[in-house]
Amino acid sequence: MSIAAAQISPEALYDMLQLFDAQPWTKRLHEELAELWALCISRNQQLLLRELIKDFCMLDADKELNACKEFNTQIQDWKLNPTNTWVVAVANADEIDGSTAGLQKLKNKVHPHEEWHSRFISNIPSSAEKINNGDNVILFDDFIGTGKKMARKILWLKKLLLQRGVGDFKIFCACFTGMQFGIKHLIDESNRPVFASISLKRGISERYVGDELTNALSVMKEIEGQLGETYRNKKLVDYTLGFEQSETLYCAANDNCPNNVFPILWWSIRKNKRPFKTLLQRAG
């Protein structure tokens, strides 16, 4: 279906041309954009979505490569070396998630490769069998949202290691991208250094102020009112403005969308129970 076939208004067509220019990845999603604009019941809703999508951070190949390079630099700044340092994905045993995928991309970017390649571990249970007293551990996730998940993973790793009598080690945290408020929470909660190549502000609350903020939040909730109350056994009320109201505008290219993202971009059921073609995809 072409944009013209969608019979959208001239104003909506102008919005999309702006988005195609600002966010080239949206060009292949013109049908999804047309559906999203058609879902809106006011011009104010369309204008808010236009501005938010223009601010969206899509982690493409170039940004990802830069994040890997900056991670490598951060390791040097932390003065860590491969003889006693482990880089551990925060995944559970036998789980494939964003942390394991990101770790694989990091594996050949940390120098010197021949010394570091064996120091990457794909999940926390496996790492708990290898970490010893005096070691350094970099817990890695591709994205830090609220920071609470990483804080829980730190406690879990400590518990597993104590079962082996290992208690003298240092933990560092790292991600490709993180929400500023989540990174701050993690630092405050764990007192650990945290690296993020890209740090993001909340999409609405940390962009608008005063009456504009109040209006923007109200408009977004109006838009969310067009979505189904439940989806895959989840309740929309638990994800309004994104999980724990994170207001996230981020996804890695061709990857699973974090639940911290505004649900209007991934919640694929309308309130009339009909399917909705979303800009982003989320499994789980």
Question: Where do the PLM segments sit?
Answer:
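Short, glycine/charge-rich flexible loops or terminal/linker lids adjacent to PRPP-binding catalytic cores
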Residues: 95-135, 145-152
